[in-house]
Amino acid sequence: MRFWWRLKKKVLKRWARDAFFPSWRITMLRWCGYQIGQDVYIADELIIAEELEDRGNLTLGDRVSIAPRVTLVLSSHPNDSRIRPVAPVARAPIIIEADAWLGTGVVVLPGVRIGRGAIVGSNSVVTKDVAPLNVVAGQPARTIRVLPTPPGWT
């Protein structure tokens, strides 16, 4: 049974990466077991790096916007390297809260939570949690600005 789940997930992720319509992309990713909110936009070439048997390790809140070529690393890849005993596989969920934006080429590492309304600048590497309404950029990403609270937010 695990084999069929892994095969299905690998095929769906591949199709979703280059789906013609963003709505198709989101539907296929939901079929993979990812939690995706309403009015989410995911551009072309999203890479989700994980072990294929992992389920439910990615949560995208409502109105999240993900630009092209973003990489979400849910787990580092297991291998047979001799350094594996001292550098084990890192595996942790990624949570991107409502109204967050990820710019082109962003890389998000395992265990990161990106807060509500946060903006991650293009080509940034996010290694730690991002507070709500923070604008971060760089490698590693650092806060460069804090946005004011929008009207109507509670």
Predicted regions, residues:
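A generic structural signal for short
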Residues: 13-14, 49, 85, 103
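Short glycine/proline-enriched, acidic/aromatic patches that form the donor-sugar handling elements
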Residues: 80-81, 110
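Short glycine/threonine/proline-enriched tight-turn/helix- or strand-capping micro-motif at secondary-structure
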Residues: 22, 50-51
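Left-handed beta-helix
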Residues: 32, 38, 43-44, 49-50, ...
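Residues that cap or flank secondary-structure elements
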Residues: 16-17, 52, 88
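Terminal amphipathic alpha-helical/low-complexity segments used for targeting or macromolecular assembly
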Residues: 1-34, 39, 63, 76-79, ...
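Short proline/glycine- and basic residue-enriched helix-capping loop/turn segments at helix->loop/beta transitions
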Residues: 89-91, 143
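Flexible, solvent-exposed loop segments that connect beta-strands
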Residues: 81-87
